[in-house]
């Protein structure tokens, strides 16, 4: 069941209505039933995997809490052992379903290179939707209980709804128990203002997904799937469009999730904060997929030592985090290269800080001026967009083909001679896409300037507000892309 499906538009109002009608004491049970139904709409069997990860981490939390009461002083051997078992079991589940065939493919390639004729057969597995998201959310609970950051949850059903809460189950945000778990104890009363604010968020998310991301995907697919036929600026447009597509696709999902949860009285974390207005790659990763970035910061980067042991240890830790992040995104070397490239950008950025400051002085560019920030933002966007080539390409060979074709010709005339209208989008759809992109960046710019758009809308008279809401709805219905290549299942981050 996808957010941009008719099924969800029927499912969500029914769930919300019943949620507010039934007694507070059983609301979390209702949410649990609905969340598991939501997940089982993809594949009912994989609900067992969701439950397995949930039960392991719930039981681990209780065992850690019990062990902590018996441990003396700083000796936490038993608790550490329980955490280790929880990590191993959950990561084994993740490895088996997500990385087993990737490992087999690479093993077979290695055997072939060494002349061995034996081949390991691949497993007949489908990747469970959202497995990386809910396993990371569940693991954070185990670790937080061990650290003493949260109290143990002994109610299994309430913990199950924390892990499986349907708005953020399959593509985040990856919530922490310290933020979300306690909200299932709160007595949420229906709030008309919260409903309106949540609906505004959902409309904006649907605009990002259906008007922008789905439209751009047609041109992007054409360019990347047949990259050997295109050159220069045609490839450049495809790469830049993908940078916007992946942002609007994922941010759109997160925005819908936050809005849906808000309607029911729950507050989920912000997952994107104007990432394409970042002035460095490090700044970009403080703004992009914030729930995952902070997860890796708190549970991998800092435990590795963070920046405490000198710059080279810091650089090593950055590379470990981003290589791991790349692998988290997918079982493909393209994702590993993408992650490594983003880590390398940051290492090079830190190492060349003085050199770049000297260059700015030489050319009279001040870092904190508007022109200085604009230059840094454009450079950061281009670096990130280049790395997205590896993220989008099906194989390393395809990625290298795209890069080779990108620099193979200087042909700016394709921007004006109609070539861009032969890439799957008509001239009208192409320019609707461009206007939609400008709208996305204009809204992000206002947010960057601390303009609270939703608050401003709520301060207007009721007639203006509701006209605006219906205009937004009709824009999505009229300009949402429903062409021959449209597939409601194509939320990019569902594959992770």
Model-flagged regions — what are they?
Residues 1-495:
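Membrane-embedded transmembrane alpha-helical bundles that form the catalytic cores
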């Amino acid at each position: 069941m996808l957010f941009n499906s008719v099924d969800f538009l029927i499912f969500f109002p029914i769930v919300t209505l019943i949620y507010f009608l039934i007694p507070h004491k059983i609301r979390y049970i209702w949410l649990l039933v609905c969340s598991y139904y939501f997940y089982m709409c993809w594949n009912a069997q994989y609900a067992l995997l969701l439950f397995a990860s949930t039960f392991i981490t719930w039981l681990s939390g209780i065992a850690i809490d019990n062990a902590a009461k018996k441990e003396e002083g700083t000796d936490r051997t038993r608790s550490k052992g329980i955490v280790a078992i929880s990590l191993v079991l959950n990561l084994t589940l993740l490895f088996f379903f997500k990385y087993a065939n990737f490992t087999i493919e690479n093993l077979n390639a290695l055997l072939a290179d060494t002349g061995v004729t034996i081949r390991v057969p691949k497993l007949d597995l489908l990747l469970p939707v959202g497995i990386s998201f809910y396993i990371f959310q569940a693991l954070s609970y185990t670790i937080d209980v061990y650290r003493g950051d949260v109290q143990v949850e002994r109610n299994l059903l309430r913990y199950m709804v924390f892990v499986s809460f349907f708005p953020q189950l399959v593509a985040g945000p990856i919530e922490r128990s310290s933020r979300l778990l306690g909200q299932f104890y709160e007595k949420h009363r229906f709030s008309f203002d919260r409903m309106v604010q949540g609906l505004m968020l959902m409309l904006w998310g649907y605009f990002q997904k259906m008007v922008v991301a789905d439209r751009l995907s047609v041109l992007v697919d054409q360019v990347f799937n047949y990259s050997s036929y295109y050159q220069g600026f045609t490839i450049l447009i495809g790469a830049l469009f993908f940078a916007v597509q992946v942002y609007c696709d994922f941010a759109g999902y997160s925005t819908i999730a936050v809005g849906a949860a808000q309607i029911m009285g729950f507050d989920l974390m912000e997952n994107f904060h104007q990432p394409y207005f970042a002035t460095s790659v490090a700044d970009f990763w403080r703004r992009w997929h914030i729930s995952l970035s902070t997860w890796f910061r708190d549970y991998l980067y800092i435990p590795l030592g963070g920046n405490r042991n000198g710059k080279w240890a810091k650089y090593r830790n950055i590379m470990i985090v981003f290589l791991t992040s790349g692998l988290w995104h997918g079982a493909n070397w393209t994702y590993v290269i993408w992650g490594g490239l983003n880590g390398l950008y940051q290492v090079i950025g830190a190492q060349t800080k003085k050199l770049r400051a000297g260059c700015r002085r030489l050319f009279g560019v001040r870092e904190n001026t508007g022109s200085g920030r604009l230059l840094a933002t454009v450079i950061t966007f281009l670096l990130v967009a280049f790395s997205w080539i590896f993220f989008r390409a099906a194989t390393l060979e395809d990625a290298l083909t795209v890069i080779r074709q990108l620099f193979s010709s200087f042909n700016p005339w394709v921007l004006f001679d109609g070539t861009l209208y032969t890439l799957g989008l008509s001239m009208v759809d192409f320019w609707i896409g461009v206007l939609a992109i400008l709208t996305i960046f204009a809204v992000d710019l206002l947010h960057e300037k601390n303009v609270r758009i939703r608050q401003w809308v709520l301060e207007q008279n009721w007639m203006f507000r509701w006209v605006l809401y219906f205009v937004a709805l009709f824009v999505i219905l009229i300009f949402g892309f429903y062409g021959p290549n449209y597939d409601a299942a194509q939320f990019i981050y569902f594959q992770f």
